[in-house]
């Protein structure tokens, strides 16, 4: 018993789930006049710049009828039965492409493309199945068992009830058994009703079948058994109108077929009961019925033509809004990349300019750089001074008087006399050196016609012609004493001669 309840609950949940999955599946109906559709009192959803069939259907959840007008307008509401009183127009009047998806048509200037909700259309059909099985068993002890099962099937709900009653109060032993299986299946499809007609009208269809059977048997105890089974199945299709027109052939790109199969298993068990009172054997027939329900879902794809034109309920491609979003995203990404590249270029250029060393700013820290003026130059005295003449190493236009002036110096010469002449020249020039400033001086560029030159040596070295010589270190130590004594004597002799010349 508990297993049967579990099976019934499972079937109910599956039916509800499949009903929810089939919700809002629209199918193209036909092209109708715009004035006729407006008379049905549909709700106007407004104009959308990127209108498409799928967008309008999403704007009308749970509505039975959806209509599109002139490429941008959207209407929804009403019922499928209201369309039966309208007259279809030629599909060429619904040739305006959708604004958001030009591969579909969204009505015309004076007509509308109409789509119907499959869930709303199948909700108008109802099928019911009733099955009853009764079994009566009698014997000398008057023990009976009766089983009754009823199954009602609809598109949205399913209910099943089983009533069973039995009575037995004896110890039984199974002697024989027989099993009878009755299978009943009912299926419903989400695309149309169970009855299809092209040009005729149908009000209701009812089919009933019954199969009674009677079985009797007798035993030595004058017991009899009778089994009766009756199965009735009825299905009907109702509508608000007296007649239903099914002249159009619908196209469903994706439809789901639901099949419900119910199996009834009846088992008759023969039991032999022995009473303890009079030791008389009695035979009891017990009937057990098991109900198994199986739900199967099959997905299929069908396609048909309506007035020579192929149509589909929903588009598999991207909607207009999605395409616009992709375009905007690509443009924004490109602009961002260009801005990033420009920023990197400017940053790199500024960094290179900041790392450049300006020699004009740093040359004051390099006073001896070639071509730079001295930070603290020594101003030379005027050339008109009587006690100052700039010596020069070449004969230029600015130093034409230096030759005669420089000739007045008594430069030392190498005479055969040796050291006497050198000391005499030095003593003669000592008195004149005190009249001149320091000769450690770099000549200004103006003296050499703008060409900067530096002194290679000091003036005293030039005047005295002190040349460097290679000296043997071994001979230096031996000649130190003699040179010192000779030098002192020579100095005294030179001093005496100098004094005499001054007189």
UniProtKB/Swiss-Prot annotation:
Topology Extracellular: residue spans: 24-325
Residue numbers spanned by region Disordered: 124-260, 470-503
Q: Which residues form the WSC domain?
A: 25-118
GO molecular function: any one?
transmembrane signaling receptor activity
Q: Where is the signal peptide?
A: 1-23
Compartments reported by the entry: Cell membrane
Which residue ranges run through the membrane? 326-346
Q: How is it modified after translation?
A: N-glycosylated.
Has the keyword Cell wall biogenesis/degradation been applied to this entry? yes
Q: Which residues lie on this side of the membrane: Cytoplasmic?
A: 347-503
Keyword terms:
Cell membrane, Cell wall biogenesis/degradation, Glycoprotein, Membrane, Phosphoprotein, Signal, Transmembrane, Transmembrane helix
Name under which the protein is recorded: Cell wall integrity and stress response component 2
């Amino acid at each position: 018993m508990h297993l049967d309840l579990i099976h019934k609950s499972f079937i109910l949940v599956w039916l509800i789930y499949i009903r929810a999955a089939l919700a809002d599946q629209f199918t193209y109906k036909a092209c109708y006049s715009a004035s006729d559709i407006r008379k049905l009192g549909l709700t106007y959803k407004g104009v959308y710049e990127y209108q498409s069939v799928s967008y309008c259907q999403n704007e009308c959840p749970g509505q039975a009828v959806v209509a599109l007008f002139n490429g941008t307008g959207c209407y929804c509401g009403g019922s499928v039965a209201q369309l039966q009183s309208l007259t279809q127009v030629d599909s060429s009047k619904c040739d305006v492409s959708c604004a958001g998806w030009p591969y579909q048509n969204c009505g015309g200037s004076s007509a509308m493309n109409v789509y119907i909700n499959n869930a709303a259309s199948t909700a108008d059909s109802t099928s019911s199945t009733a099955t009853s099985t009764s079994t009566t068993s009698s014997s000398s002890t008057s023990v009976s068992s009766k089983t009754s099962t009823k199954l009602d099937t609809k598109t949205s709900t399913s209910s099943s009830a089983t009533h069973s009653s039995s009575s037995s109060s004896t110890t039984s032993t199974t002697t024989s058994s027989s099993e009878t299986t009755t299978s009943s299946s009912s299926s419903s499809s989400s695309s149309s009703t169970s009855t299809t007609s092209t040009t005729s009208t149908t009000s209701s269809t009812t089919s009933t079948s019954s199969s009674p059977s009677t079985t009797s048997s007798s035993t030595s105890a004058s017991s009899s058994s009778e089994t009766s089974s009756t199965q009735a199945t009825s299905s009907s299709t109702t509508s608000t109108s007296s007649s239903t027109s099914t002249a159009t052939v619908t196209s469903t790109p994706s439809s789901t077929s639901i099949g419900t199969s119910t199996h009834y298993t009846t088992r008759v068990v023969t039991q032999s009961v022995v009473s303890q009172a009079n030791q008389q054997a009695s035979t009891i027939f017990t009937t057990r019925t098991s109900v198994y329900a199986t739900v199967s879902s099959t997905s299929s794809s069908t396609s048909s033509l309506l007035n020579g034109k192929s149509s589909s309920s929903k588009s598999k491609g991207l909607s207009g809004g999605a395409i616009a979003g992709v375009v905007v995203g690509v443009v924004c990404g490109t602009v961002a990349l260009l801005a990033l590249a420009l920023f990197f270029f400017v940053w790199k250029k500024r960094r290179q300019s900041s790392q450049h060393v300006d020699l004009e700013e740093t040359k004051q820290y390099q006073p001896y750089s070639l071509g730079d003026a001295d930070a603290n130059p020594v101003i030379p005295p005027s050339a008109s001074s009587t006690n100052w003449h700039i010596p020069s190493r070449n004969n230029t236009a600015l130093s034409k008087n230096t030759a005669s002036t420089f000739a007045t110096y008594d430069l030392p010469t190498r005479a055969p006399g040796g050291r006497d002449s050198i000391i005499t020249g030095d003593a003669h020039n000592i008195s004149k050196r005190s009249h001149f400033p320091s000769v450690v001086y770099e000549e200004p560029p103006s003296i050499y016609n703008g060409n900067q030159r530096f002194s290679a040596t000091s003036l005293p070295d030039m005047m005295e012609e002190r040349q460097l010589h290679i000296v043997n270190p071994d001979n230096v130590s031996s000649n130190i004493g003699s040179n010192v004594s000779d030098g002192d004597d020579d100095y005294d002799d030179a001093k005496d001669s100098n004094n005499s010349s001054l007189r």
